[in-house]
Amino acid sequence: MKNLYDNVLQFKGKWRDYQDRVLQNSQKYLADGKLHIVAAPGSGKTTLGIELLRRLGEPCLILSPSITIRQQWLERITEGFLLPGREPEELLSNDLRHMKCITAITYQALYSAMKHYQGQLSDGDDESEEDERESEADDFRDFDIFDAVKAAGIKAICLDEAHHLRSEWWKALETFMKELKGMTVIALTATPPYDSTPGQWKRYI
């Protein structure tokens, strides 16, 4: 099968040892369609996640805890992978209603789409001051996220720090994932929920 990202994306740096080990064994790790990566902040999880998605070579959806982190994903793809002569707009989107080969959204946007919400979406950090949060207006009143995902041909999903979600966002994510069949899932975290209940741990993995 043709890889959508051939001649479009290529990592411009040098892999760290742990990244190289993961990549060399990625087919084995992804045998069940799921890969969980735990690594410290600043260790290059985002870059590794992008490379894994690039190697899968199919349309994908990246979910992040906040607008700020969502944009960091898109910036990292543009700066660290996008080949000369290619424009980010050809490949990247942050809008569920206009998905591209790589679409990055927030968990709040997913929740809002599933609830057909219209209004202002603010950044996901509850600890930040209200006037410091980034926000966006959205209207999902006539939007069917499952039809949109199917139309976009999404085959892979990357979950960034999914276990830190507020409960209603997590429930929306669970419902969303249960409805999708045959998806490859890559999950990234710096802080896995080791102190969680057995039920919470099962939900995480």
Task: State where each predicted segment sits.
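Conserved pre-motif I regulatory segment
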Residues: 1-38
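Conserved helix-turn-beta segment of the N-terminal RecA-like "Helicase ATP-binding" lobe
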Residues: 67-97, 202-205
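Inter-Walker segment of RecA-like/P-loop motor cores
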Residues: 81-141
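Walker B catalytic acidic pair
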Residues: 160-161
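Post-DEXD/H (motif II) to motif III coupling segment of the RecA-like Helicase ATP-binding lobe
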Residues: 164-205
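Loop/turn-to-beta-strand initiation segments
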Residues: 59, 99-102, 153-156, 181-186
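Conserved Walker A/P-loop ATP-binding site and its immediately adjacent core
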Residues: 46-81, 106-109, 169, 192-196
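Walker A/P-loop
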Residues: 31-52
